[in-house]
A protein has these predicted regions:
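Soluble non-cytosolic domains of exported or imported proteins
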Residues: 373-380, 422, 497, 514, ...
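Acidic/histidine-rich catalytic neighborhood
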Residues: 526-586
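Amphipathic, well-ordered alpha-helical segments in soluble domains
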Residues: 147, 495-502, 527, 575, ...
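Short, contiguous acidic/charged loop-to-helix segments that flank catalytic cores in large enzymes
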Residues: 490, 512-515, 633
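Extended, hydrophobic alpha-helical segments in both membrane/secreted and soluble proteins
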Residues: 424, 492-506, 519-533
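Loop/turn elements at helix/coil->beta-strand transitions in domains of secreted/extracellular proteins
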Residues: 512, 521, 539-542
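Aromatic-residue-lined binding/catalytic grooves and analogous aromatic/hydrophobic interfacial grooves
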Residues: 6-487, 505-507, 525-528, 542-543, ...
Length: 663
């Protein structure tokens, strides 16, 4: 076999789930107390529905999300004044007036994105005896192998357990509450939300919550009727208890009370009126409450064991495709390193040195001790936790994983919880293919398709270009134009191009020719068409991007001022090379190498401005030798790391793939 030859290997996507029973160990994230903040709660999800389990004892909050709950409505992502503004910015860049170009770039901005919303909370209240629970008996865990959040504690001689999972087959969040003594389970349950909503009891054992998202990200201070109609939603909570033992009472038409049961089962279903990125909520024909009740009806003949078995069959088919083990003895505390034990003394009461410490040591303490014991099993856990999160927030037919996956507890979350295209969205899906979760990437492909629809209008009107374009941030409505804000992140028309590299990668892993021909290639064609029109010839004959930014980064211009707009950032050039490589390679597979577009891409690729190296040999972010980077605002400014990384990512891939040209 010659270097660079292709080798046909078995399609791992169809592999049978296997776990090495001899060396595998429980993959669990463990806690020894209730969550004190939202980020300490346990995330569960089925791709569409998400929940955060706090693990409170006398009172509990299970925070809920549904992936289509966003503010806003479909919008127009074009600006007929942009071509004139683009010409002005380009002239300023050509004349070396980078500060002025940065200021003038504001005329290329569009509106900001809409905002991902929360669904609400399940609120559980137990009687006062639970205030006296035994802290030593408390245990909360996320079992990655079963995608189940569990809670266990004792009150006197009664042990209470709660189990939580989000079923994809039945589209329901399931919670089971049990006590070790007959008739020991008593509590009240209600639903609540920060969104406009109302609740009522249905049939004596169900709570229905109906509400709506704002029609605009910041609701105007006008009469409610003047506010555009936003996405409507409904959540249905069904309550079941043990046969013949215990009763359910209705309190104030919004709360249910359970008294003296052996166990209780809560089923949470939710739906919204969202139909597509191109359908106004006011035009939706979906009835969220009817849909939720219909989904509940489909579970009528399923016991808890049935629901759990169906959940496991679905989830483990994905999760157990990959096992990851760094060393066979990773489940034991190192016995011959006194320094390790000495530094673990603060945790000594929680560590059973003769057994498997992962069953008793809270994960946060394992993280703290990692600097001393370098426990490889913690790395294994982190790896699988990443796979768990992707499975939980991105499934076929769901929305794309946003900035926080699917979990959010605020009406005004950081960065709108929006899909951020300048690295965050790509990072969400980097594990999908290498970690054998190709199905979980399907929402990303669907999202790219929606972006291409709106992006073709933005490209044509704003930039007088063919094909389609997307910028640094989007939302459920597939926003494709630049956002309001700072040019260093808003003015970046490479978002769609970078996403398209995932399409070629998907084919490389799956060898799905039908996908390549009917889904990936048309999107790559549109992306390549835009890139070719966006490139302009520079003074030295290179094809350049102008204006150009290196996302979220600035430089000190020759006039001594901070600027961010210039030409041909290394990131732009790296992404464009990736796109050209992808479509040229795809055309060879599909026998389209002679197409006009492919010939244009082949001709343009060697004319792209080459990567610039600084005097110390480092890769420069911009093609300008006479500028410098401002120091970070704070020494711990880790966000600076994501910008150079995006540039380097392409060069690393070029070095790894036979036949690829280096920049």
């Amino acid at each position: 076999m010659e270097d660079g030859d292709w080798v046909l290997v078995e399609n791992l996507m169809n592999s049978i789930p296997m776990v090495d029973s001899e060396t595998s160990k429980p993959l669990k994230v463990t806690f020894n107390g209730p969550a004190k903040s939202w980020t300490d709660a346990i995330p569960i999800g089925n791709g569409r529905l998400g929940a955060m389990v706090w693990g409170g004892v006398s009172s509990e909050i299970i925070q809920l999300n549904e992936d289509t709950l966003w503010t806003g409505t479909p919008s127009d992502y074009t600006n007929p004044d942009s071509p004139e503004a683009l010409s002005q910015v380009r002239n300023l860049v050509d004349n070396g007036k980078y500060t002025e170009a940065t200021e003038a770039a504001v005329n290329l901005f569009g509106n900001t994105t809409e905002v991902f919303q929360l669904l609400g909370d399940i609120k559980l209240q137990f009687d006062d005896s639970h205030l006296a629970y035994s802290e030593e008996t408390y245990h909360r865990e996320l079992d990655l192998d079963t995608a189940t959040a569990r809670l266990r504690y004792s009150v006197g001689d009664v042990e209470y357990t709660r189990e939580h999972f989000a079923s994809n087959p039945d589209q329901v969040i399931v919670i089971k509450i049990s006590g070790s003594k007959l008739g020991s389970v008593s509590f009240t349950v209600s639903l609540d939300s920060k969104l406009d909503h109302h609740c009522y009891i249905n049939g004596g054992s169900q709570i229905i919550m109906e509400g709506s998202c704002p029609g605009k990200r910041i609701p105007p201070k006008v009469k409610e009727g003047d506010n555009p109609k936003g996405i409507q939603f409904s959540a249905v909570l069904d309550l079941q208890i043990s046969d013949g033992i215990g009763i359910i009472r209705v309190l104030d038409n919004m709360t249910l009370e359970v008294e003296g049961s052996d166990w209780a089962l809560l089923l949470l279903l939710a739906s919204s009126s969202f139909e597509s990125p191109f359908t106004k909520p006011s035009a939706s024909k979906k009835d969220p409450t009817s849909e939720s009740l219909r989904a509940l009806k489909s579970t009528a003949n399923l016991s808890y064991s049935d629901l759990y078995a169906r959940h496991l069959d679905d989830y483990q088919n994905l999760f157990q495709r990959v096992s990851f083990q760094l060393q066979k003895s990773s489940n034991k505390v190192r016995e011959n390193e006194p320094l390790v034990i000495n530094n673990l003394m603060p945790f000594a009461n929680a560590v059973n040195l003769k057994g498997n410490k992962d069953d008793v040591v809270p994960t946060v303490q394992r993280i703290k001790s990692f600097q001393f014991d370098e426990d490889p099993s913690l790395v294994e856990l982190l790896f699988q936790f990443g796979r768990y999160l992707l499975i939980s927030c991105s499934r076929p037919g769901t929305q794309v994983a946003n900035l926080q996956g699917i979990w959010n507890n605020e009406l005004d979350p950081k960065w709108d919880c929006a899909p951020t295209l300048n690295i965050n969205l790509e990072m969400n899906y980097w594990p999908a293919l290498p970690c054998n979760l190709s199905e979980c990437q399907e929402p990303l492909v669907d999202f790219i398709k929606s972006l291409s629809v709106n992006g073709s209008k933005t490209a044509q009107v704003n930039y007088q270009a063919s094909g389609w374009v997307a910028h640094h941030r989007s939302d459920i409505w597939a926003k494709s134009s630049a956002s309001e804000g700072n040019a260093k992140w808003a003015l970046w028309p490479m978002g769609g191009a970078w996403l398209c590299t995932h399409l070629w990668e998907h084919y490389n892993y799956t060898m799905d020719r039908d996908f390549l021909e009917n889904e990936a290639y048309p999107l790559l064609e549109g992306c390549t068409s835009f890139v070719l029109d966006w490139l302009i010839e520079g003074p030295r004959g290179y094809l350049e991007t102008n204006p150009s930014t290196s996302p979220e980064h600035s430089f000190i211009a020759p006039d001594g001022k901070i600027a961010s707009v210039s030409y041909s950032s290394t990131m732009d050039m790296a992404i464009i090379r990736e796109v050209f490589y992808a479509i040229i390679s795809a055309s060879e597979v599909l026998s389209k190498s002679e197409d006009t577009l492919i010939q244009k891409a082949r001709a343009a690729e060697p004319r792209l401005r080459p990567t610039q190296l600084a005097q110390d040999g480092s890769i420069m972010e911009w093609g300008l030798f006479h500028i410098s980077q401002p120091p970070p605002k704070r020494s711990s400014d880790c966000r600076r790391l994501d910008r150079p990384a995006t540039t380097l990512e392409s060069h690393v891939r070029e070095a790894q793939v036979p036949g690829r040209k280096g920049a």
